[in-house]
Amino acid sequence: MNISIRNGMMAAGLALACAAAIPAAAKGTLVYCSEGSPEGFQPQFFTTGTTFDAVSVPMFNRLVEFETGTTNIIPGLAESWTASADGKVYTFKLRKNVKFHSNANFKPSRDFNADDVLFSWNRMADDNHPFHKLTAGQTFAYFEDMGMKNIVDKVEKVDDYTVRFTLKRPEAPFLADMAMDFASILSMEYFETMMKRGTPNSADVYPIGTGAFEFGSYQKDAIIRYKAFDKYWNGRPKIDNLVYAITRDATARYAKLKTGECQVMAFPKPADLDEMKKDPALAIQQKEGLNIGYIAFNVEKKPFDNKLVRQALNLATNKDAILKAVYQGNGQVAKNPIPPILWSYNNAVQDYPYDPAKAKQLLTQAGFPNGFELELWYLPVTRPYNPDGKRMAELIQADWEKIGVKAKLVTYEWAEYRKRAKGGEHQAIMFGWSGDNGDPDNFFVPLLGCEAVKGGGNNARWCNKQFEDLVIKAAQTPKQADRAKLYEQAQVVFKEEAPWITVAHSIRFDPLRKEVQGYKMDATAHHYFNNVDLAKTP
């Protein structure tokens, strides 16, 4: 797939030239070695960090944002906001003089205003909205996984620069939710213009936002080019050009970083970290991960509808060995679906120990004394929560073999993997999550909630009423201490039911060349280059 803002298609010669070699950073150009291709360029459709990094982070804004490096909420396209005493009405005062990007097919005639907020939200929320089903086969996955239709009653335009969200119920994480990627603000004028021209789908393919960088061109699995947006409301970026060199293999990313072919790289191999730290040209930033790596069992498929089978496979998995071999010790074994750095983490929960004999007993009790066969899907790309999906799968395969469970290892190209998982084709699947907003709700609801079964984000396809009631009640509870008690109970239910094997919480590392200035690791595993500069070389 080749797309460009100049003419709708990238000339083949230019595409090949871009793919063949990305020169060492020219003045004002930063090259980031990313780990994979985005699934598309519409931030409302997708849920992966790879796509967010390439789309919503550089090119879009939300009403509120997270301060880089933290999950503190700061003004974005809304300058200020107020909430009613009952927690059900939020009023946002919008920022004026915010410009939208342009491309060869669209030049905005007005600034951002309330119409764009209503358009962006109602497109997701209203099944009858003219742009709701614009792109065939695409759904608003995050919006649906979070059950936002059950939370927001209506969005109203008070005036051109004031919007009011009325909720159906109090929702403690609502502001944090509004800072997430799915809540990016689109240009209503752009979509309507493309509709009038008879090419409405192009608005979902060629992105127009208000962010720090404008889209330039894209060649699938090779390169994305952006340019600094001169009219960015929060100050023009210091670099002129941003290039994503899509490099799936972590070893190849490291090689490019060493030679200066890129200045920042995604997700290094843990085994390379010691060598990186000795290189005087490199700097390594690290942060405890707001994440979880896990194996989900599809409870809609036998034998995973049987809790004893799920518990047995938990007992059969040597997570300490995985932490050592896959993570090189850079993290900790997980026992809960949320990381220990997140408030409400229940440290009293007892994990399943590595106990093959007990696992074998449970399998016999479940009616499988000789084990069974299954497919174990493993990640095809490096993720912040899992540096080597194939190696992890091989270790788990060997563990399960000891109790008679024969696992066939399966994977697909990343977008295809996601698509098939969303459709529930898998039996057992390797996945993970990096928190988006610093609230426990952001783990429990989109990963384990009943609405997320419909949306496809709940890979276990597990809908448990006791768990669901606790999580919903927690979201409606204003005091954090009271919410924490409910989430702690939910973790007990989760552990007993065992829809996942909770594998590990990783430490994250961002390697960069020392000429990169002003880069700050993000708490949610995104990569922001808005405030980055490159030191002048002699």
Segments (PLM) and residue ranges:
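Aromatic- and charge-enriched surface segment that lines or borders ligand/interaction sites
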Residues: E79-F131, R164, K256, P303
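Structural transition elements
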Residues: V333-A366, R383-R391
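A structural "hinge/loop" feature
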Residues: S37-D53, L77, A104-K107, A172-S184, ...
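Surface-exposed binding/hinge segments that line
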Residues: R6, K93, A125-F191
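A bilobed periplasmic-binding-protein/Venus flytrap-type ligand-binding module shared by bacterial periplasmic
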Residues: E67, K227-D230, G289-A312, A316, ...
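Detector for C-terminal structural segments
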Residues: T29-S34, T51-A54, A172-P173, Q219, ...
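Ligand-site clamp/hinge motif
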Residues: G198-D204, F229-E275, Q286, A393, ...
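N-terminal lobe/hinge region of extracytoplasmic solute-binding protein
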Residues: C33-D86, N122, H129, I208-T210
